[in-house]
């Protein structure tokens, strides 16, 4: 793949290139390329489904009902070791730019311009990370500039649709608007990474006179205010309307169906809530389950549309979540905190498996063998080159290095790009309450081994993931050679990509580098 780095990259020039590219595309070539749907769920844990991604069913799999995830898995391939970042913004910025979070430095969640969102510390000075997010154009401080794969799709003849959560850039920055990323249609996407409410009775976060009462108010759904339609359903209906229009165009489409579900608040989706109460779940857990099934219904509605419109055989569907399930805030879930993603340890915000391992499925008729599982690992930035390769785009230019590696060989069964490959995460931030693997740490996964390093204490933990999926047995003392080797590799990667680390306020000295 030829990815030349450009010295500068202007959005205006992209528009011109896009027009020329579309003129060159013949209708015959366009029709041969698949439609692509990336169905991204917010804060969905590895166990938040009736589809078992582990080797055995858990009580969570028994409690939840996601028949359309099961339906999709029958048509495609389940990935049991698909990784994202531990926080939404980091994942979505890696997705859209193909850069690892150590490189783009959007390591915590973003919202307001020029404002970091970290919880303050009396002893630790956090790095000046990119809290304004990512952008395709220069000129905004604390912003990573990268080339959008969606823009490349658009240049090469794809009709591009965004529906739901964006969370690429802070308020009043170029990156907050999905149309600045190559999306021709934007439905309800803006800077916020959450939502005020799923309820139309509250106008999704707006007062009666139409003013948002929260920065998390969902824009663009005014037609649904007061209708009794849950936000997940409203977004689905709008996505289907956009697909109805797209079908009239003589070009393939890319739909980024990026649900706000199942992010807090855990509002009750009354289409499903009573059923879970009858199943014996508590009020909180039944509400959480209703969010999950509402999301699953959306997936089924899109699959039904594809079948009804004779597009199912020519459409790739990728199902993914942006980080682990919420497990650190007792106000929204019942049960002991940090356990809601078991057998995985911890949850959202953590570099343990519960915070970064995601439920992922890929369906591609004629390419991916139906009803199969892949136990090889991959990471979110790999979606960038893979989706472009799916679209037949292999020769392109970017302003930033692409850290992702195509997982097409895994889809086709022709190779294993994960063998001997290191995956890296960096979180020199303080997200929320402390917990297992949460705050001020970095990590590397290579083959069966995973090292977690804590900046503040210098502690190193080593886990054999295939043998210890719950990360309960730290074997660092038993394998000092592996700890040393992974520490060096992680340290070298952080230096090479500009990975940041905190400092001590008292001395001004940087916290100990992992390889020091």
Located regions from the model:
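Long, internal low-complexity/basic segments
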Residues: 22-34, 41, 46, 78, ...
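Short, solvent-exposed turn/loop segments enriched in Gly/Ser/Thr/Pro and often Arg
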Residues: 53, 78-99, 107-114, 162-174, ...
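A long, amphipathic alpha-helix that forms part
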Residues: 230-247, 274-315, 332
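C-terminal cap/loop subdomain of S1 sulfatases and analogous C-terminal strand-loop tails that border
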Residues: 185, 190-193, 325-353, 368-376, ...
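Formylglycine-dependent
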Residues: 111-159, 166-251, 259-268, 282, ...
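A short beta-strand-to-alpha-helix junction
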Residues: 32, 60-66, 83-87, 118, ...
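Active-site segment of extracytoplasmic enzymes that catalyze sulfate/phosphate-ester chemistry
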Residues: 21, 38-39, 46-147, 152, ...
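Histidine-centered active-site microenvironments of extracellular/periplasmic hydrolases
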Residues: 174-182, 264-270, 304-367, 379
């Amino acid at each position: 793949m030829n990815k030349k780095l450009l010295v500068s990259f202007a959005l205006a020039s992209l528009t011109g290139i896009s027009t020329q590219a579309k003129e060159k595309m013949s209708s015959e070539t366009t029709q041969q390329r698949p439609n692509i749907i990336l169905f991204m769920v917010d804060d969905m844990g590895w166990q938040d489904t009736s589809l078992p991604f582990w080797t055995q069913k858990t009580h969570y799999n028994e409690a939840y009902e996601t028949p359309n995830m099961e339906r999709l898995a029958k048509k495609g391939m389940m990935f049991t070791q698909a990784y994202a970042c531990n926080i939404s913004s980091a994942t979505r910025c890696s997705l859209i730019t193909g850069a690892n979070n150590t490189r783009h430095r959007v390591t915590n969640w973003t919202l307001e311009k020029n404002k970091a969102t970290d919880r303050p510390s009396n002893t630790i000075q956090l790095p000046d990370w990119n809290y304004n997010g990512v952008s395709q154009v220069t000129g905004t401080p604390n912003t990573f500039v990268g080339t959008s794969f969606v823009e490349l799709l658009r240049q090469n003849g794809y009709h591009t649709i965004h529906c739901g959560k964006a969370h690429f850039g802070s308020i009043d920055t170029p990156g907050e608007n999905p149309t600045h990323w190559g999306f021709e249609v934007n439905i309800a996407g803006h800077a916020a990474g959450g939502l005020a409410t799923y309820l139309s009775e509250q106008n999704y976060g707006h007062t009666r006179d139409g003013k948002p009462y929260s920065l998390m108010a969902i824009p663009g759904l005014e037609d649904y205010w007061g209708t009794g339609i849950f936000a997940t359903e409203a977004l689905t209906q709008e996505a289907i309307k956009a697909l109805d229009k797209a079908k009239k165009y003589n070009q393939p489409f890319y739909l980024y169906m990026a649900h706000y579900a199942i992010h807090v608040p855990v509002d009750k989706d009354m289409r499903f809530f009573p059923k879970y109460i009858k199943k014996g779940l508590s009020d909180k857990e039944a509400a959480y389950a209703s969010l999950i099934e509402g999301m699953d219904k959306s997936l089924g509605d899109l699959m039904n549309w594809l079948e009804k419109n004779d597009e199912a055989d020519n459409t790739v569907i990728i199902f993914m979540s942006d980080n682990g399930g919420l497990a650190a805030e007792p106000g929204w879930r019942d049960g002991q905190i940090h356990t809601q993603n078991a057998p995985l340890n911890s949850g959202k915000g953590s570099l343990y498996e519960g915070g970064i391992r995601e439920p992922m499925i890929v369906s591609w008729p004629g390419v991916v063998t139906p009803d199969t599982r892949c136990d090889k690992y991959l990471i979110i930035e790999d979606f960038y080159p893979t989706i472009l390769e799916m679209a037949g785009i292999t020769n392109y230019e970017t302003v930033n290095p692409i850290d992702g590696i195509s997982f097409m060989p895994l889809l086709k069964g022709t190779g294993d790009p994960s063998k001997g490959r290191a995956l890296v995460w960096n979180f020199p931030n303080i997200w929320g309450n402390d917990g297992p693997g949460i705050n001020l740490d970095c990590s590397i996964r290579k083959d069966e081994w995973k090292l977690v390093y804590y900046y503040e204490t210098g502690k190193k933990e080593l886990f054999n993931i295939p043998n210890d999926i719950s990360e309960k047995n730290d074997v660092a003392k038993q394998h000092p050679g592996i700890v040393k080797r992974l520490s060096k590799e992680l340290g070298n990667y952080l230096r090479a990509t500009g990975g940041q680390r905190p400092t001590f306020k008292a001395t001004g000295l940087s916290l100990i580098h992992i390889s020091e």
